[in-house]
Amino acid sequence: MNEPEKIDPRELSPLALAFVGDSVLELLVRTRLARHHRMSAGKLNVEKVKYVSARAQFREEQLLEPLFTEDELAVFKRGRNASKASVAKHASPEEYRASTGFECLLGWLYLNGQLDRVHELFDTLWQQFDPNETR
């Protein structure tokens, strides 16, 4: 993942940060799956959904929250508390809000140029999924 175009994340709404963060997580998961699993695109997509659904992101955030810095926790809470008109079909409102907060944090880190931190959190998370796989 390359350095993003410089955008001041403070100028974006929490939901705009979550929009970016959703793409960051999606790209990381897709890349890791494609690199380590030789299967059809359809099967890769089935696997991907296990990691990028609102329910999965809720569990991921719960695993990582103890590692968040004070600033990261504030950004997560800002995203979690953002007003939502809709919720995911297969997730509770709590899960959906937490997943939005997690996406907001990833978008904020990415747009702040903190790619090492994005990878650090993702690698920690991925070790929970499959301890035998590395970046």
Per-range role (PLM):
Residues M1-R135:
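Double-stranded RNA-binding/processing signature
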